Amino acid sequence: MEAIKKKMQAMKLEKDNAIDRAEIAEQKARDANLRAEKSEEEVRGLQKKIQQIENELDQVQEQLSAANTKLEEKKKALQTAEGDVAALNRRIQLIEEDLERSEERLKIATAKLEEASQSADESERMRKMLEHRSITDEERMDGLENQLKEARMMAEDADRKYDEVARKLAMVEADLERAEERAETGESKIVELEEELRVVGNNLKSLEVSEEKAQQREEAHEQQIRIMTAKLKEAEARAEFAERSVQKLQKEVDRLEDELVHEKEKYKSISDELDQTFAELTGY
């Protein structure tokens, strides 16, 4: 009878221990489920972060499109400036040709003026010589005087033509100076446009490089999310298996916690790097 009591007490004690172990196992299973739910929440948070990154990438692509549009506008402005410069060059060439013709006419007028002056001088010398000789031939004197008048008229006409040519030459020179100033202004404008176009090209290249790096980081991030999702599914399977083997579950959950901490740190590092990249892109 005593042996039966001892056996019953032992069985009761074993029953109590079994109940305690079962309660501990249930508690560990609940903890594992909580950890699994927390992992799911973190995955959802990662998915939201990915969506945010995709939105920011769309903004970067819009900025790239705007930069391309601005570059096309600069190219059109450069083409317009080149057309203006070509027109100025043609205008300068016409002015130079007109100047050459004016100079040629001036040479002719100057030669005629010299010829008229020589004729006037010759007539004056002849008149003085006739006066000294006391020539009384009035008709001859009249003729000489008429020749003198004609010579003087020719000289005056040559003077007027010379003044007109000089005035036109001054106007042509003024037009030429203004055309040269416009040409210099056009060349300065071209230099400014070329410099601005070079700066835009450099910024565009930097933006394309930054976008390529962001794309590479995004792909790496997506790969990391897929890995984490697979590991989460594996953790859920292990949580189900933990209901049948509490001791194995505890070890697996501890390992998952360490791995999750490591993934959080890695994700934080990736997020910081992406934030820095987008900050640089926004700065451009």
UniProtKB/Swiss-Prot annotation:
The molecule is in a coiled coil structure that is formed by 2 polypeptide chains. The sequence exhibits a prominent seven-residues periodicity. Keywords: Allergen, Coiled coil, Muscle protein, Repeat. Residues 1-273 form a coiled coil. Homodimer. One of its GO terms (cellular component) is contractile muscle fiber. It comes from the Eukaryota. This is Tropomyosin. Belongs to the tropomyosin family. GO terms for molecular function: protein homodimerization activity. Ubiquitous, but especially prevalent in the anterior muscle bundles associated with legs. Expression in the mid and posterior regions is probably related to the numerous, small muscle bundles associated with the digestive and reproductive systems (at protein level). One of its GO terms (biological process) is regulation of muscle contraction. Tropomyosin, in association with the troponin complex, plays a central role in the calcium dependent regulation of muscle contraction.
